[in-house]
């Protein structure tokens, strides 16, 4: 007789946004590792950029797009009814998928830390996960560790977030090395939370450091700002800096703007770069990690993915955080800590112009980064932790409620 195999449990992974490729790349790496133990379905809040692919064994479901940034909760008041209808539609998709999958684990990115606006769609899902109809699912919150400036939050916001975590979540996973950043530095409710919090390390690419992009010439300065939605000031300053530096030395520079740089800014940048043989401007590259590996120096806003790559490769890096309110705090904190650990230099956004950037790049060319020893196995560690926690929850439930015919999905 053939040996009977146990059906693998389902896992629902709710990704906060499909718009930002850096967030998606982290989601992909964690989902890839979770798929070793679970049948993983990722629920996406927005469409996936064309150049990003999920593993074949990870299913994806697209929610109706709200057309707003959940980080800022900014929306046109005239769209209030439309947004209410969209939230109901998204909630219905989440519930439908939950009923279909009967997941053993529900993992949710960033709620309730950054996504109070999405409470109406997320809470009904969590309540179903906890009501025991299909067994008490493990509910996991996930965040990258450096939150918005907690000083700008009032006590009620922080306390409400902590209450939601204690009421609905079994555990919180922080995708950071605790030596680098701990969540309690940025999130300080009045009462101590009861939900367990685990810092699992930074999430890096499964294959480690990517091979160098062969299209990038030696001794190149690579300028990037994630998807580019707030990269315009950095890119314009980079063009001016290249012109200033070009008067005394030959310095190849490649600017990768990202898909979300507004079209008018893109066209203006291309026009300004025209006629400079050592300056190239591109919307995207096949693999930003490969481009960073090939570059001699990196100038970036210190997004999560760029910071992790700096830790991996020790590429001399200049960090110029975004002036955008939503991104600035996390990028500045991340950059300051990398500078402290000897990874690079920092130019604050209020000091950014062509001359200051040229001076910092010139200093960067003489900079020698130090080796760092942070945990970069965040995807593996998180997947192992979730797998063990789900198993423990199963065993605890079996002991508390023994039954000859366990109806829970396996």
Place the predicted regions along the sequence by residue.
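Conserved nucleotide-sugar phosphate-binding/catalytic loop shared by glycosyltransferases and other
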Residues: 7-15, 33-85, 89-91, 96, ...
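A short, glycine/small-residue-rich beta-strand->loop->alpha-helix junction that serves as a flexible
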Residues: 14-28, 231-233
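Donor-nucleotide binding loops and adjacent catalytic segments primarily
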Residues: 31, 187-188, 202-297, 332, ...
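A donor-sugar binding/catalytic signature common to diverse glycosyltransferases
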Residues: 46, 287-333
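Conserved nucleotide-sugar donor-interacting segment of glycosyltransferase catalytic cores
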Residues: 95-166
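A nucleotide-sugar donor-handling region in carbohydrate enzymes
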Residues: 143-232, 258-263
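Nucleotide-sugar donor-binding patch of glycosyltransferase catalytic domains
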Residues: 312-363
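C-terminal amphipathic helix plus adjacent low-complexity
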Residues: 359-410
């Amino acid at each position: 007789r053939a040996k009977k195999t146990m059906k693998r449990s389902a896992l629902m992974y709710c990704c906060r946004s499909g718009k930002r490729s850096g967030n998606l790349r982290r989601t992909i790496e964690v989902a890839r590792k979770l798929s070793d133990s679970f049948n993983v379905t990722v629920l996406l809040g927005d469409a996936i950029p064309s150049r990003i692919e999920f593993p074949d064994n990870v299913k994806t479901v697209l929610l109706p797009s709200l057309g707003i940034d959940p980080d800022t909760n900014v929306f046109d008041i005239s769209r209030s009814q439309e947004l209410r209808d969209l939230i109901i539609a998204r909630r219905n998709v989440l519930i439908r998928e939950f009923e279909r999958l009967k997941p053993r684990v529900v993992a949710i990115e960033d709620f309730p830390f950054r996504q109070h606006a999405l409470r109406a769609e997320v809470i009904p899902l969590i309540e179903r996960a906890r009501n025991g109809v299909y067994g008490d699912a493990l509910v996991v919150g996930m965040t990258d560790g450096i939150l918005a400036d907690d000083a700008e939050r009032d006590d009620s916001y922080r306390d409400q977030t902590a209450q939601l975590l204690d009421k609905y979540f079994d555990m919180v996973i922080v995708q950071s090395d605790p030596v680098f950043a701990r969540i309690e530095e940025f999130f300080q409710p009045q009462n101590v939370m009861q939900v367990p919090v685990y810092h699992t390390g930074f999430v890096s690419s499964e294959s480690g450091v990517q091979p160098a992009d062969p299209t990038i010439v030696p001794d190149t300065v690579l300028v990037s700002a994630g998807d580019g939605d707030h990269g315009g000031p950095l890119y314009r300053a980079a063009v001016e800096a290249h012109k200033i530096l070009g008067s005394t030395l030959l310095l190849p520079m490649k600017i990768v703007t990202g898909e979300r740089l507004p079209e008018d800014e893109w066209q203006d940048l291309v026009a300004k770069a025209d006629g400079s043989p050592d300056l190239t401007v591109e919307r995207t590259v096949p693999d930003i990690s490969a481009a960073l590996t090939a570059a001699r120096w990196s100038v970036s806003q210190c997004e999560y993915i760029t910071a992790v790559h700096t830790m991996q490769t020790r590429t001399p890096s200049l960090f110029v955080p975004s002036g955008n309110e939503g991104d600035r705090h996390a990028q500045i904190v991340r950059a300051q800590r990398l500078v402290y650990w000897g990874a690079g230099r920092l130019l604050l956004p209020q000091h950014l112009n062509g001359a200051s950037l040229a001076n910092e790049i010139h200093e960067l060319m003489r900079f020698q980064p130090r080796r760092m020893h942070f945990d970069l196995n965040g995807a593996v560690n998180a997947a192992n932790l979730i797998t063990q926690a789900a198993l423990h929850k199963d065993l605890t439930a079996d002991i508390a409620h023994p039954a000859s015919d366990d109806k829970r999905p396996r």
